[in-house]
């Protein structure tokens, strides 16, 4: 067996220098350290950067309470239901909710009346009123209308009773909320 080398002389079993292994570990450690440094830099830059907040105008809304009629407000079988502001950014003037921004509005009417009433919603001069209730004591109605600047929302109530002076409202409220802010708003 002259062609076979003895095991000690085999090149595959020769000890390798430790320099290559140490060099590989050093390169891996440097790459890992650079990755960690890059992550820390990113986190530090974004945690100390001032946040830019978008400034949207407040959403137009109002919650009003339906009021009890006084004797001077109740002279006919048809009258405007008095409103009192409880909360919100919109205003009540002469028992009407004043619309300052163009857009779609959600109008919600809730309450219980002591006698049967028909309620229509008026919102623009020259336009037909929107009928909400027809001869009922309980109101739980929601409607979405396109309203514009200078519109005034008010409720007209009609009773079959000889006198509306006995009419009372329990837990009555009208809520008006702008659904799509960003359109034209009065300054």
UniProtKB/Swiss-Prot annotation:
Keywords recorded for this protein, A-Z: Cytokine, Disulfide bond, Glycoprotein, Membrane, Signal-anchor, Transmembrane, Transmembrane helix
Domain of life: Eukaryota
Single biological process term from Gene Ontology: immune response
GO molecular function, one term: tumor necrosis factor receptor binding
Disulfide bonds: 74-164, 101-185
Domain THD: start-end pairs: 58-177
Subcellular location field: Membrane
GO cellular component, one term: membrane
Amino-acid biosynthesis recorded as keyword: no
InterPro entries: TNF_CS, TNF_dom, TNFSF4, Tumour_necrosis_fac-like_dom
Membrane protein topology class: Single-pass type II membrane protein
Positions annotated as glycosylated: 94, 156
Membrane topology, Extracellular segments: 45-187
Keyword check for Disulfide bond: yes
Main subcellular location: membrane
Segments crossing the lipid bilayer: 24-44
Cytoplasmic topological domain: 1-23
Function: Cytokine that binds to TNFRSF4. Co-stimulates T-cell proliferation and cytokine production.
Similarity comment text for this entry: Belongs to the tumor necrosis factor family.
Subunit annotation: Homotrimer.
The protein's name: Tumor necrosis factor ligand superfamily member 4
């Amino acid at each position: 067996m002259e062609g076979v080398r003895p095991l000690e002389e085999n090149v595959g079993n020769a000890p390798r220098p430790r320099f290559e292994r140490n060099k590989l570990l050093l390169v891996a450690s440097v790459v890992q350290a650079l990755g960690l440094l890059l992550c820390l830099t990113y986190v530090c830059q974004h945690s100390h950067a001032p946040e830019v907040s978008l400034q949207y105008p407040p959403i137009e809304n109002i919650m009003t309470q339906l009021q009890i009629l006084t004797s001077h407000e109740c002279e006919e079988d048809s009258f405007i239901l008095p409103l009192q502001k409880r909360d919100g950014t919109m205003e009540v003037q002469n028992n009407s909710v004043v619309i300052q921004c163009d857009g779609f509005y959600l109008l919600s009417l809730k309450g219980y009346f002591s006698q049967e009433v028909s309620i229509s919603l008026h919102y623009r001069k020259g336009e037909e009123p929107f009928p909400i209730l027809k001869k009922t004591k309980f109101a739980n109605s929601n409607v979405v209308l396109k309203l514009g600047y200078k519109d005034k929302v008010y409720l007209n109530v009609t009773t079959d009773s000889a006198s509306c002076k006995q009419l009372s409202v329990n837990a009555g409220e009208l809520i008006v909320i702008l659904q799509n802010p960003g359109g034209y708003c009065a300054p």
